[in-house]
Regions:
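N-terminal signal peptide c-region/cleavage motif recognized by signal peptidases
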Residues: 14-17
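An N-terminal assembly and electron-transfer interface module characteristic of large anaerobic redox
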Residues: 8, 19-584
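Bacterial N-terminal signal peptides that target proteins for export
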Residues: 1-8
Length: 584
């Protein structure tokens, strides 16, 4: 009788253990997005496991009783700094030998207070990631908790240290040849190949929604996207990944490491490298409303360092939605449009390229063709010679002639009554008012009202003239073959006003001139000549600009090259981050 009671008691205890779900605690830094916690909690629940997650900010620690009742603690620490932060927050809580745990990221993986075979299996599931592995992790925990064997489950599926990804492929590819063979039926044979550098963690975390949409948009632009992850520690990672691929441009989508090695590889590849960022402090509406599109705490890592490695034109392309990165359509299209323009610039023969060059008038003065410590006329003459030698169709003009031309052009802004004579002499260009109004009326209502409130109705602008029965903006500009030479228009109606003002909207004529450069003249690239102009100082976010901000509306997707004095690092940052420029 006593033996029967003992058996029943043991059976009851076993059944109770089975009835109570295994308890998993997931602890990470706040670098790990909440969407991962939510997704893992859902998969755990489907396996009969309860997961409670906690994301720690710097200096935070889990509540004293948070670990109580946990059967397994998972430490998710992607970077060494995350690992140090989480381990410091835990203190000596793991030293007692009673809390089973695994740790992945920020260094070699590890586990404690678990049988070696089980600990290695759980680490393998979590470290390699992906939905199949992570679901098996929770099934393994459920079985272990219930006293059932775990080794009958499939072993962890390894995720290679390098590979190629596409959302429509059945699985990632270990090498480029297999990926290109798979994509041969998707892309035109001459589709430009664009490398997208993605984090391995996005694949492991099954957090690829924003990447998936970007790759599909890239294909709609006629591009062949090569989404690759690689081992940062390998100094030849990109060379090995893209050997024989004829990659035309690179787009960085991750927190890139090993900068010196990547810089050397970028130089060897000799293609444009564009930087992208994600906004982690809210959704798209929050980002649009923010004065800074990139938080100060991330500016050094995601703006400053990448610039020193050769990346340019940083664009914020995603924000958080329900804890997951979500692509912002307008920003993504701005990135892809810029890629299209860069690809066109690379493919066009030099003789067919049209370049626009803007020079400055600061400090103001009708005869002042100036830039900081730059002899502008002499430099223009030398640039013209170099362009002709490279095959560009640029008319010959010596320094003296360039001085005369540039000063006459400036006179059109100081004495608007001379515009008619300049136009007759071929020293002015024009844009139909209707073309400007078509562009202007497509602006958001708040921008239109802001400009009207400050500058009035564009139909009454002083630069309008009747030409062949049509109202047109007229402004100084000289054609030197396929090079358009023009003074940058006054950003606030009159020369010298509001040069660094980041609150006053630009004048209608200012935007009309840039529209002409983009659409009327059809420039393939724009040269902002010397230190410095005003476009990069227009109102908008201080960094991480939206395509709706004035600086980007003026430029559109034009590639910009900006010879800049080397000792003015601070203002050159504005040219790169707000002027979409490659500084020279």
């Amino acid at each position: 009788m006593r033996r029967s009671l003992l058996f029943c008691g043991a059976l009851l205890a076993s059944l109770c253990a089975w009835a109570e779900p295994a308890q998993v605690r997931l602890l990470s830094s706040d670098f790990v997005l909440p969407g991962k916690h939510q997704r893992l909690a859902g998969w755990a629940r489907e396996a009969g496991v309860e997961l409670r997650g906690l994301r720690l900010g710097i200096g935070e620690a889990p509540p004293g009783d948070w670990l109580d009742g946990g059967d397994l603690l998972i430490l998710d620490t992607p970077r060494p700094t995350d690992r140090a932060q989480v381990e410091q927050a835990l203190g000596e809580r793991l030293q007692g030998g009673t809390q089973p745990w695994i740790r992945v990221g920020g260094g070699p993986p590890g586990f404690g207070d678990l049988p070696a075979a089980l600990g290695g299996r759980l680490v393998g599931y979590y470290a390699n990631g992906g939905e199949a592995n992570l679901r098996r992790l929770f099934e393994a925990v459920r079985r272990w908790h219930a006293g059932l064997p775990v080794d009958a489950l499939p072993a962890p599926q390894p995720l290679a240290q390098a590979g190629f990804y596409h959302p429509d492929a059945p699985a990632p590819f270990a090498g480029l040849a297999d990926y290109l063979a798979w994509g041969a039926s998707r892309w035109a044979s001459d589709a430009p190949r664009i490398a997208f550098l993605i984090p391995r963690g996005a694949i492991a975390d099954a957090q690829t929604g924003a990447i998936d949409e970007l790759l599909r948009r890239s294909e709609r632009h006629g591009q062949a996207p090569l989404a690759v992850w690689f081992d940062d520690s390998d100094p030849e990672a990109l060379r090995k990944s893209f050997a024989g691929a004829d990659v035309q441009a690179l787009v960085n989508l991750q927190h890139l490491q090993n900068g010196p090695a990547r810089r050397a590889e970028f130089l060897a590849l000799d293609v444009p490298v564009l930087q992208t960022l994600g906004y982690r402090d809210g959704n798209e509406a929050d980002w649009l409303a923010a004065a800074s599109g990139v938080a100060p705490r991330t500016a050094a890592a995601f703006l400053g360092m990448p610039e020193t490695w050769g990346m340019s034109d940083p664009l914020v392309i995603s924000a958080l939605e329900n804890g997951e990165p979500k692509l912002m359509a307008g920003q993504a299209e701005a990135l892809l449009d810029k890629l299209d323009r860069l690809l066109r610039l690379r493919r066009l023969p030099a003789a067919d390229k049209h370049l626009a060059l803007m020079f400055w008038n600061h400090p103001e003065g009708e005869k002042n063709v100036a830039a900081s410590h730059l002899n502008v006329p002499a430099s223009l003459a030398r640039l013209g010679e170099a362009l002709r030698a490279a095959g560009y169709r640029v008319a010959t003009s010596d320094e003296s002639a360039l001085i005369d031309t540039a000063q006459r052009l400036l006179g059109g802004y100081y004495r608007p009554q001379t515009l008619d004579a300049l136009y007759r002499d071929g020293l002015a260009a024009s844009l139909p008012l209707d073309a400007y109004l078509h562009w202007f009326e497509a602006l958001p209502a708040d921008l239109r009202e802001e400009m009207r409130a400050r500058w009035g109705d564009p139909r009454r602008h002083w630069a309008l003239r009747d030409i062949d029965g049509q109202r047109r903006f007229v402004f100084p500009a000289a054609r030197l073959g396929n090079l358009l030479l023009l003074p940058q228009p006054p950003r606030a109606g009159r020369p010298g006003e509001a040069y660094h003002d980041s609150a006053v909207p630009p004048d209608h004529l200012y935007l009309a001139v840039y529209q002409f450069v983009r659409e009327g003249f059809g420039a393939d690239a724009l040269i902002h000549f010397g230190t410095h102009g005003t476009q990069e100082w227009l109102p908008g976010k201080d960094r991480g600009l939206a395509v709706g901000d004035y600086p980007l509306r003026a430029l559109g997707d034009l590639p910009v090259f900006y010879p800049y004095i080397q000792d003015n690092v601070g203002e050159a940052i504005q040219a790169r981050r707000r002027g979409r420029a490659v500084t020279v």
